[in-house]
Amino acid sequence: MEMEQVNALCEELVKAVTVMMDPSSTQRYRLEALKFCEEFKEKCPICVPCGLKLAEKTQIAIVRHFGLQILEHVVKFRWNSMSRLEKVYLKNSVMELIANGTLRILEEENHIKDVLSRIVVEMIKREWPQHWPDMLMELDTLFRQGETQRELVMFILLRLAEDVVTFQTLPTQRRRDIQQTLTQNMERILNFLLNTLQENVNKYQQMKTDSSQEAEAQANCRVSVAALNTLAGYIDWVSLNHITAENCKLVETLCLLLNEQELQLGAAECLLIAVSRKGKLEDRKRLMILFGDVAMHYILSAAQTADGGGLVEKHYLFLKRLCQVLCALGNLLCALLALDANIQTPINFGMYLESFLAFTTHPSQFLRSSTHMTWGALFRHEVLSRDPALLAVIPKYLRASMTNLVKMGFPSKTDSPSCEYSRFDFDSDEDFNAFFNSSRAQHGEVVRCVCRLDPKTSFQMAAEWLKYQLSASIDTGPVNSCSTAGTGEGGFCSIFSPSYVQWEAMTFFLESVINQMFRTLDKEELPVSDGIELLQLVLNFEIKDPLVLSCVLTNVSALFPFVTYKPAFLPQVFSKLFSFVTFESVGESKAPRTRAVRNVRRHACSSINKMCRDYPDLVLPNFDMLYSHVKQLLSNELLLTQMEKCALMEALVLVSNQFKDYERQKLFLEELMAPVVNIWLSEEMCRALSDIDSFIAYVGADLKSCDPAVEDPCGLNRARMSFCVYSILGVMRRTSWPSDLEEAKAGGFVVGYTPSGNPIFRNPCTEQILRLLDNLLALVRTHNTLYTPEMLTKMAEPFTKALDIVESEKTAILGLPQPLLEFNDHPVYRTTLERMQRFFGILYENCYHILGKAGPSMQQDFYTVEDLASQLLGSAFVNLNNIPDFRLRSMLRVFVKPLVLFCPSEHYETLISPILGPLFTYLHMRLSQKWHVINQRSILCGEDEIAEDNPESQEMLEEQLVRMLTREAMDLIMACCVSKKTADHTAAPTADGDDEEMMATEVAPSSVVELTDLGKCLMKHEDVCTALLITAFNSLTWKDTLSCQRATTQLCWPLLKQVMSGTLLADAVTWLFTSVLKGLQMHGQHDGCMASLVHLAFQIYEALRPRYLEIRAVMEQIPEINKESLDQFDCKLLNPSLQKAADKRRKDHFKRLIAGCIGKPLGEQFRKEVHIKNLPWLFKKPKPMLETEVLDSEEGGLATIFEP
């Protein structure tokens, strides 16, 4: 009767599986079939016989696979409820299936083999070794039955190692039992694997040349591949003694297989894992056999053979692995020589370097890049860096670097052998470009290491390359009329042009070498005359190509340190740089400047600035010449852009700091700022800055024309406003008093001392800046008011979007790839709207930068300005409701944070508290509303739809901006309230990267975080205190893991601890504790967040439970909480007389209590849990038994259910 039922059910199941797998089935039928199959697996009592019948080899593959899936489901989810006989029957049936129910090795489907091995491993995980002691013997018996069974045994051993050791997918006790039993049998297992490999390889090599035995040869090859894969799964964790046993027999076998095409990749994988292992010095020392003649011969010949037949994907993949093996060998050698002085450099070290250099000169950019780290380790190594073989390879390495630094090999191009390899490694030119830039940065570090060892050779080669480029004719490459090809204007170079890529590479090389050479050589050894000669050649070089000119400018900067030894050269250098400041590529044409031209001019200004910053003493004797140059350029209002003017003014200010005379510098700054003061304080400007309608008209935002070709009537007005703001910021940023206290005193910069004895300085620019402050605050107030809807309507149609975020910022915020090409031949601004957008954006940023710099720059002179708090509240904090998130974020970062951090404590009450109280309250209200909208949107639309369908959607941008504003607000609160620690784990960059990545490592909550004096001051004010607490604890429930992590570890507890001594309302305590539990629900899936939140909840409960019974009521609402366990926890907590358990045990107990509210990753939320029972302890030492207990014991040992 049962067989009839089985047959009938199997027929139904076959039909259902056929419907599921038939592409022509409708969705409805497919879902019904799936439901039937799932219900069968969950509920049917005769799953095992049905599964076995469906798994017979007479069935088609999809039916067999489903039958085996049924058996796997039974083992995973029903095993604990099965009787001993049922388990034995199922185990024997599966082993019989493997022995006689499989096809020949080349015919059997891989997915059938995979599921068969999974079933056996699932049974092993539940019963071995206690209840299945003969498992290894049974596998050995199976192994002898044929090639398919051999391969399956390999799969079983590999999967067992992966589940137990690599992925650890079973309970701790079971994992420990199985791993210890594996370790006990490891010699036997590895010998078995190695013998299997050798036997099958020998058979394969004998048969592969005989066409009549091709099938048998392939079968042996399959088993060999499986044996290599299984070895790879064990080599990673077994004792190194096993790997190096019998004079490294395993390693020797793997080296031999490097020349066997079908097996070389697996052999290289195993070698790589073995050589990369960490372990005892004595054990790792034996792996030095790989530097022997035989091993080196096999590695070299394998590399040559694989590379000989052109680009074949399989061979290329092998080359990558082999390159990694050589890298690991180099790292092994470095480690061993550093640890043991008795170890000698291998005789074949030179041969190793030659083979490694071959990978460095390979056309593949990926292979070249893979060698950088190891070269760096070799060149930095204390012992190897002095080795003659390594020193001899330096010229060859530098020569290779000169080729490798050239950016060639774009996947879309065909101008280099690298291109073909890049098409395998990169999806697009943008991917390649990002990879190359990162790789070149690493390469530069290695070049600097080489220069440290042999500066003269490095400089000589850099000099030769520079001379060659100066004498070579310009090759712009093939002309392409398509603008996206990146061809330059008027026949100039593009970023792909042969000449430009050579110039760019040479410049990078020269810069790396010279910077390091000046650090390495003594003054007497520096090749000053050669350096000056090179600088003279560069200064005499004439060219009009903007891209090449940028490289020339970098070379001037790189060679400039030589001028410190020949100061007479300085005027000549400045003369050249000033000629670049006014560079035009098309003569006196009034056409808009291109990006390439703008970049050259900015680069020149930046170079002058850098020289004045780094070598002010050198420039000071030539100050008058520099000043007259700059005054001449500034006299023509249209000659330079406002940024260029400001950069040159900054250069003058930097040199003026060397006056070290307060009065002299103050007079100079008055003279320098006179044009700015005249414009800024003029009646016309005052009216424009203080009246919104006048401002709109003054900047031209009410004009309807937006054609860039039409003359811009208000362009000069905007330029003047920008010039003033740029100049105020530049002067304030660059003016400083002497760093030496005695010099500062002598120069009149010190005006007194604080009560603690610190000197009080005065800044020479203070008077000038304070004169301009009122109008600056008026501009800030006016700019903020622009965002009101009624003011936006006063703007002409194209300019209503002028206050929006620019496209480039959107792209950066969304993390979208930047376009590879900057269109150098395009105008800087294509429309007046784009120009106006940039004007408003830079003006807004610079105003807040000025207010942010005012505190640290002018110190007490700024903080004692009359009614400063009310002036700032009436300007910078006006109309915040309409200010967009990206602007508010910028304001918090560049203005509010430095204003607070540099404020003397005596001004906390009068300045900081009146500003921060309303600000924190407002920020909490704004962020709560924003996150509520985002959470509602997620519920209504589904997260995936928002995040994946259209990453450029407005919703995605808004959410990311809210996230960034949240982080900035939390950062500000922490800067105000929390004392900085020496080891600050949140010192991650404020760049908004992937949250998951930041949460990858568990962060232990810190116990040394304390409130600052400012934090204590703020907490005295009830409104500020409430805003801080609510914001900190609310942030735990916002969907931003980084903000949650920071608040949990650094903010919540110190703030709460400050108010716990007072009287907290019960409702407030309930809300605070609930917020933490909600945070766990939201962020529990991230290990780092979860650990911190559990710790915080534990701290709060332990501290407040004795005083507030209400907190117990919150605990009782947690899903699946164990009330008895909670009673036990409370009993120990509330009864001081009971001995307290260790902190970790109490915390673990608490974590188990609140487990019901800890959020899980989406992938685990609906997954059926697998329960594996622990078996009797296998390796635990039993307690000594009394004689009477021994006599009374009925069982003499462990029961074994899988006895034959």
Swiss-Prot record:
Tell me which GO cellular component terms the UniProt record holds.
cytosol; nucleoplasm; RISC complex; RNA nuclear export complex
Give the function comment from the record: Mediates the nuclear export of proteins bearing a double-stranded RNA binding domain (dsRBD) and double-stranded RNAs (cargos). XPO5 in the nucleus binds cooperatively to the RNA and to the GTPase Ran in its active GTP-bound form. Proteins containing dsRBDs can associate with this trimeric complex through the RNA. Docking of this complex to the nuclear pore complex (NPC) is mediated through binding to nucleoporins.
Q: Which key words tag this protein in UniProt?
A: Acetylation, Cytoplasm, Nucleus, Protein transport, RNA-binding, RNA-mediated gene silencing, Transport, tRNA-binding
Q: Where in the cell is it found?
A: Nucleus; Cytoplasm
Q: Which residues carry this modification: N6-acetyllysine?
A: K396
Q: Which domain of life is it from?
A: Eukaryota
**Assembly and oligomerization:** Component of a nuclear export receptor complex composed of XPO5, RAN, dsRNA-binding proteins and dsRNA. Found in a nuclear export complex with XPO5, RAN, EEF1A1, and aminoacylated tRNA. Found in a nuclear export complex with XPO5, RAN, ILF3 and dsRNA. Found in a nuclear export complex with XPO5, RAN and pre-miRNA. Found in a nuclear export complex with XPO5, RAN, ILF3 and minihelix VA1 dsRNA. Found in a nuclear export complex with XPO5, RAN, ILF3, ZNF346 and dsRNA. Interacts with EEF1A1, ILF3, NUP153, NUP214 and ZNF346. Interacts with RAN and cargo proteins in a GTP-dependent manner.
Instruction: Please list where the region (Necessary for interaction with Ran) is annotated.
Output: 1-108
This chain's source organism reads Mus musculus
Gene3D superfamilies, per database record? Leucine-rich Repeat Variant (1.25.10.10)
Molecular function GO terms recorded: mRNA binding; nuclear export signal receptor activity; pre-miRNA binding; RISC complex binding; small GTPase binding; tRNA binding
Entry-linked Pfam families:
Exportin-5 (PF19273), IBN_N (PF03810), Xpo1 (PF08389)
Chief localization: nucleus
Region (Pre-siRNA binding), start-end ranges: 641-642
Site label Pre-siRNA binding, positions: A441, R448, R718, Q1045
So what family is this one in? Belongs to the exportin family.
Identify the stretch(es) annotated as Necessary for interaction with ILF3.
533-640
Any single biological process term in GO:
pre-miRNA export from nucleus
What is the designated name of this protein? Exportin-5
Q: Which InterPro entries match?
A: ARM-like, ARM-type_fold, Exportin-1/Importin-b-like, Exportin-5_C, Importin-beta_N, XPO1/5
PANTHER family to which the protein is assigned, alphabetical: EXPORTIN 1/5, EXPORTIN-5
